[in-house]
Amino acid sequence: MSATKFVKPASVHSRILVPGRYHRQPVISRLVSRYDLTVNIKAASLTLDSESDGWFDLELSGNPQKLTNSLSYLQGLGVNLVQLAIANQIQATDNSLAFPDSAYKLSPKDSAWLTDRWQEQFQQWMSLGQTNRLRLQLCVLKTYYEQPVISKLVSRYGLTVNITSAILQPDSQDDGWFDLDLWGRTKQLYSSLSYLEKLGLPIWLDLSSVYGDR
């Protein structure tokens, strides 16, 4: 009987440019669910304007073959792999395409709607007949810069996560702000919010979608 061969996980650092037409598709979420990767977002710049490209610096880790397949998937979508580093060795790069220093900033809601209010909002969301889609704004504190917070929403709770807008400067200069569209069962959504609360990350539920975009 042969022993199962252990495959050492690999790590890839990639800067990607996502075309505007894919802003409403959970591209990064699929890297986790489809290829079983851990994805840490190291920097992000994405606006709600579908005409603008989205920029992400990603740290991808997982099975080497699945990593290769995931990069092929991105290229198949027309995602530009601006910079790619494997084991800290630059494989392909275009230094003329530096990460944008965007003046765009998300507007956090009033501090009264911090993490201690999400359960009340969640109950309101359920009372209006919502069961599988939830929008929220998430602040990823700079102390969590090295942790794949959004990736775990997919791998641990089985959610589909679409990032609709984001701003996270490189090198943990500031907190990161993300507008997220979460899809999943009610229990999964509730558990994921509890997880974010335990981390101490500020979250605001966006109930406007309940009324205006069912």
Short names for language-model regions:
Residues 2-177, 181-214:
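Long, contiguous binding/interaction regions
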